């Protein structure tokens, strides 16, 4: 069952930016296809996903959607798609 705050944010996004809404929905579906029992909640203005710990967030901006990884520094990135130069966090712009 989808959390009320998740549903509300999705409705708001669909009303204000349908293109970003479709992209966010595709990313959410991809996440659930890999981690079907992931928990999702609204945090920091986006969608945060967790299992035993938080593993990513999906954020819709005016010009793009960002998939952010709190420990992205630990991810293999053979194709160089991760952005960010901080100590831990990395993101992908879509």
Identify the function of each model-found stretch:
Residues 1-93:
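Charge-dense, helix-prone N-terminal extensions
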């Amino acid at each position: 069952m989808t959390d009320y705050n998740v549903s509300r944010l999705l409705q708001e996004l669909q009303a204000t930016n349908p293109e970003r809404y479709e992209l966010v929905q595709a990313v959410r579906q991809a996440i659930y296809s890999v981690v079907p029992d992931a928990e999702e909640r609204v945090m920091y203005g986006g969608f945060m996903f967790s299992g035993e710990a938080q593993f990513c967030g999906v954020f819709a901006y005016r010009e793009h959607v960002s998939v952010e990884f709190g420990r992205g520094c630990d991810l293999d990135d053979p194709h160089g798609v991760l952005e960010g130069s901080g100590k831990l966090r990395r993101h992908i712009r879509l």
